[in-house]
């Protein structure tokens, strides 16, 4: 289906998460819509190095969240998160219980429990989940947006042979031997037979792409029966896959993936290297800003500069009080000496300086 009308260009966005990631989803959604273009004429295609010609139209973002165990209270807070953007965005929840869970049985049990089973495999089913869409963007929720996502929706238009648009995974930065050592250890932890992987399969995963951000050509998925191909592969090799859906995509469809610039999925480890360039999505691939005491060389994740962007967006969502309540409970439980040790003084000072400066601007403008 063509999702553009003379009045509106629809851009569908998909994410999947459970109740533990609802707060992260709120921050991801708020930051995404804060930077999102509202008209096709406003889209900046420079990150893609493309010059797409689009019809003039207002952009409407239709967000679909596949949820597992997310409470009604959390759902209401997510809906409130979108209220400032209600003129050009909508939110729909899809309960995971409405889907067929049988494909989870194809996975290694430990991997399924660790990575969410159907919550990650669902990205292989987007073409059948959304039969009325020709394309869709899928994002992880451990993210914060610093730029406009709209350009990615049109990334595949100039190459109709490509099935997906994705950013290369961090594995590609490792020497191949070091990568294989890491994967062998990972397989051992999950009791997976490492020898089941061919050299070619390992090379594809090594030079493969990350599922944290992707744009999918759903028409191409349907025309070529790629969903059936993916599920058949899952039946025969699913128990070998340590990162289930990502390994599958890279092992089976690697040649059909368009490489997107790292700006669309900039891993937190590379933040300092790429900021303040055109970072569009910052991805906390290891340490999550909302987790309690995730340490990195003795420091907490909120010590990291990039977490400041996440916090600034959190303060604009209905989940901010939940975050502070949890931090205070942690202090009572003596997991931290004080809230100050969790978010360093400079982060707090910078935030309040930013707020005070904005308040003063408004005051002087009124006077």
Positions of predicted regions on the chain:
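Glycosyltransferase catalytic domains, chiefly GT-A lineage
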Residues: 1-367
């Amino acid at each position: 289906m063509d999702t553009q009308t003379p009045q509106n260009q629809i851009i569908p966005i998909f994410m999947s998460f459970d109740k533990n990631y609802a707060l992260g989803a709120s921050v991801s959604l708020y930051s995404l819509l804060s930077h999102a273009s509202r008209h096709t004429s406003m889209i900046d295609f420079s990150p893609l190095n493309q010059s797409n010609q689009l019809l003039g139209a207002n952009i409407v973002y239709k967000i679909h969240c596949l949820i597992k165990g997310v409470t009604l209270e959390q759902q209401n807070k997510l809906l409130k998160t979108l209220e400032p953007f209600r003129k050009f965005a909508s939110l729909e929840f899809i309960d995971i219980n409405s889907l067929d869970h049988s494909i989870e049985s194809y996975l290694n049990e430990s991997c399924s429990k660790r990575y969410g089973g159907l919550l990650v495999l669902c990205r292989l089913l987007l073409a059948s989940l959304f039969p009325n869409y020709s394309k869709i963007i899928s994002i992880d929720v451990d993210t914060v947006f610093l730029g406009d996502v709209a350009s990615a929706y049109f990334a595949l238009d100039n190459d109709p042979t490509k099935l997906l648009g994705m950013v290369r995974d961090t594995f590609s930065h490792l020497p191949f031997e070091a990568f294989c050592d890491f994967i062998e250890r990972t397989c051992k932890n999950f009791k997976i037979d490492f020898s089941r992987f061919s050299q070619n399969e390992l090379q594809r995963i090594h030079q493969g792409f990350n599922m944290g951000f992707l744009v999918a050509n759903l028409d191409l998925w349907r025309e070529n029966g790629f969903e059936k191909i993916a599920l058949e592969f899952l039946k025969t090799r699913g128990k070998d896959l340590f990162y289930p859906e990502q390994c599958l995509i890279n092992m089976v469809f690697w040649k059909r993936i368009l490489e997107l610039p790292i700006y669309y999925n900039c891993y937190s480890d590379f933040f300092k290297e790429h900021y303040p360039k055109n970072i569009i999505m910052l991805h906390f691939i290891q340490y999550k800003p909302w987790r309690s005491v995730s340490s990195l060389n003795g420091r907490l994740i909120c010590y990291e500069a990039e977490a400041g962007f996440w916090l600034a967006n959190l303060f604009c969502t209905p989940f901010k009080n939940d975050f502070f309540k949890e931090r205070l409970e942690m202090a009572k439980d003596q997991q931290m000496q004080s809230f100050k040790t969790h978010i360093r003084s400079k982060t707090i000072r910078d935030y309040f300086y930013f707020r005070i400066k904005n308040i003063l601007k408004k005051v002087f403008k009124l006077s």
